[in-house]
């Protein structure tokens, strides 16, 4: 491999904001936040809104994430059309 053309590949902690699960893995991401991991070392922290720990496909639980009332708007519109 050529030197100085590849991004630095290091350890990063990914935190799922929906379930508060954390995963230590490797990535080329460079987040500014840091966290102390179980082994006592400090690693960069990257926060994600959803991961395999909270996604309905992987958990088998169906949840509706509705922060702006879109589901209620849909139900109201559907109810008007069906009557």
Swiss-Prot record:
One of its GO terms (biological process) is translation. SUPFAM superfamilies: L28p-like. GO terms for cellular component: ribonucleoprotein complex; ribosome. Transmembrane segments: none annotated. It comes from the Bacteria. Keywords: Ribonucleoprotein, Ribosomal protein. GO terms for molecular function: structural constituent of ribosome. Disulfide bonds: none annotated. It holds the Pfam family Ribosomal_L31. Gene3D superfamilies: Ribosomal protein L31. InterPro entries: Ribosomal_bL28/bL31-like_sf, Ribosomal_bL31, Ribosomal_bL31_B, Ribosomal_bL31_sf. Part of the 50S ribosomal subunit. Belongs to the bacterial ribosomal protein bL31 family. Type B subfamily. HAMAP family: Ribosomal_bL31_2. PANTHER family: 50S RIBOSOMAL PROTEIN L31, CHLOROPLASTIC, LARGE RIBOSOMAL SUBUNIT PROTEIN BL31C. This is Large ribosomal subunit protein bL31B. The lineage of its organism: Bacteria, Bacillati, Actinomycetota, Actinomycetes, Micrococcales. The gene is rpmE2.
């Amino acid at each position: 491999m050529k030197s100085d053309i590849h991004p630095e590949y290091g350890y990063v902690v990914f935190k799922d904001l929906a379930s508060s699960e954390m995963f230590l893995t490797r990535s080329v991401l460079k987040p500014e936040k840091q966290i102390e991991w179980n082994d006592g070392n400090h690693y960069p922290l990257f926060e994600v809104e959803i991961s395999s720990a909270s996604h309905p496909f992987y958990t088998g639980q169906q949840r509706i994430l509705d922060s702006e009332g879109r589901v209620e708007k849909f139900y109201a519109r559907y109810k008007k059309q069906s009557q």
